[in-house]
């Protein structure tokens, strides 16, 4: 079973769309499972709705979404008072536009009949545990929204009932482990950060510092996940009479740093990141 694992990265998710234009649209590579965290969950949810053989349609949908996206389609200020809303509101921005965008592109019947598996990861602030949505979990729209609810900027999502879920990147930069547990024998991973994170243009604002910190954390978490996966392969390879097989892991990441602000969904920057993804693929 082959899986595609998509990392978080906010507006840098356009890079994944560009890469998949080549991988799905020109190489016609197919996947049995799509797993994502944060913006990767949004892309995974879109892709999982298409049957084998319809990969070109899937990448056309992603291409249209990311080529025409705008910040207004993702979030807006909660109040006219900007940062003062943090005092009385659960987040700086409202993601009502993002929920509408997710809902407009989601067809539960298509997903149910696609034959594809899905994994989306968020973190429950109440229990500090991971929440995983599969293709069979109710309310996948809320699951996708929860997975990309960047702390402080976006409001946590009360789904499932009794929980309060935020960006899955807090615990998992990529759901590599979820793909392996689901039975994947080959995993393609598309990251939104290059191997060496570039220098930062210092900005003394919380919404600039926060994404920078999360990006550094995510890079470290993925490297740890990859080391664990390689250790798993070594153990399986040396185990006698084991029914488990080593997992082939292919990692793609930007050849150089992408345009930096993960909350900037402007169309021109999105298209630049898409072009970078296509070229790197």
Residue ranges of each PLM-predicted region?
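Patatin-like phospholipase
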Residues: 2-5, 10-102, 134-146, 191, ...
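Short, hinge-like loop/turn segments at secondary-structure boundaries
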Residues: 51-52, 205-208, 268
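Exposed alpha-helical structural elements
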Residues: 57, 61, 97, 101, ...
């Amino acid at each position: 079973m082959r899986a595609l694992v998509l990392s978080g990265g906010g507006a840098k998710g356009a890079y994944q769309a560009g890469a998949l234009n080549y991988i799905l649209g020109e190489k016609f590579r197919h996947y049995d499972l799509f797993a994502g965290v944060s913006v990767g969950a949004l892309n995974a949810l879109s892709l999982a709705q298409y049957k084998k053989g319809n990969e070109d349609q899937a990448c056309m949908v992603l291409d249209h979404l990311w080529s025409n996206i705008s910040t207004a389609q993702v979030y807006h200020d909660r109040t006219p008072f900007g940062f003062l809303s943090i005092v009385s509101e659960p987040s700086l921005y409202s993601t009502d536009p993002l929920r509408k965008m997710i809902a407009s592109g989601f067809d539960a019947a298509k997903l149910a009949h696609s034959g594809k598996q899905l994994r989306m990861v968020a973190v429950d602030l109440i229990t500090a545990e991971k929440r995983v949505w599969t293709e069979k979990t109710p309310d996948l729209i809320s699951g996708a929204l929860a997975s990309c609810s960047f702390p402080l900027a976006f409001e946590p999502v009360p789904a499932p009932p009794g929980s309060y879920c935020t960006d899955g990147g807090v615990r998992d930069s990529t759901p590599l482990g979820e793909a392996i547990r689901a039975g994947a024998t080959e995993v393609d991973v598309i990251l939104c950060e290059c191997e060496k994170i570039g220098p930062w243009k210092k900005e003394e604002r919380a919404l600039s510092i926060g994404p920078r910190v999360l990006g550094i954390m995510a890079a470290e978490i993925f490297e740890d996940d990859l080391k664990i996966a390689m250790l798993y392969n070594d153990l399986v390879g040396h185990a006698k009479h084991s029914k488990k097989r080593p997992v082939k892991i292919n990692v793609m990441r930007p050849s150089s740093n992408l345009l930096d602000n993960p909350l900037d969904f402007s169309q021109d920057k999105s298209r630049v990141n898409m072009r970078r993804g296509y070229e790197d693929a």
